[in-house]
Amino acid sequence: DQKQALEQLLQKEARMDSRCAKAAVTLGLAECLRFGITSVSDLYYYPEATAEILAQSGMKGNLALSSYRFIDQNEDFDFDTDEQCQALVKAVDTWHGHDDGRIRIDCGIHSEYTSNFKLWEALCGYASEKGLGMQLHLAETQEEVDGCLDRTGLTPAELLSCHRFFRVPTTAAGCGCLSDADRAMLGKFKATAAVTPMTCAKQGN
């Protein structure tokens, strides 16, 4: 069950801190280098801690804070006071363009089903203003797609597109359950699908 798996994952991640993030990033980058990978896209937490390790490694990377918003979409939302959005702003001010552009900061959401349109639109506006890219997990499982279709009558890609999500350069991780129409639309917007083979293997996709 996707919801239960996500809840268990969030409980584990809630115990993390920047020290844990740095250790995990160091191991992850070492594994990348082992296979000759020198450029990464990272969508997770603690972007500043990740940027520190990336800077030391000499690798190139696009880093995004995996933002989420579970509260009622009717509740007030203010980009200028939201904790995650302000963490993003700080990371952009500190790290975006570091070392002649070797490190770039993107905006990001975890996924369609862990956020809502107020966050999407605020991040898209900020990304457009600052010339940033966008990252997200998209259509990783059929359960995710079916859930969105049941709620809205649209696929996750279609729903996000209604809110002009793909009008900024977008990197979508997963993409294993896109429809033909989704693929055509993402191609139209020149979105990039990022391959995540280990994640897909763990999920049985």
Name the predicted role of every residue range.
Residues D1-E7, E13-L29, C148-S161, A173-G187:
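Short, composition-biased local secondary-structure segments
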Residues F165-N205:
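Active-site-adjacent C-terminal substructures of enzyme catalytic domains
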Residues V40-P47, Y113-T114, C175-S179, T199-A201:
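Short beta->alpha connector loops
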Residues D1-M59, Q84-H98:
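Alpha-helical scaffold segments that flank or form the walls of functional sites
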Residues I37, M59, G131, K190-A191:
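A structural motif
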Residues A51-G176, R183:
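Metal-coordinating catalytic core of metallo-dependent amide/deamination hydrolases
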Residues Q11-A14, L33, I37, I109, ...:
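Short, basic, glycine/proline-bearing loop/turn elements
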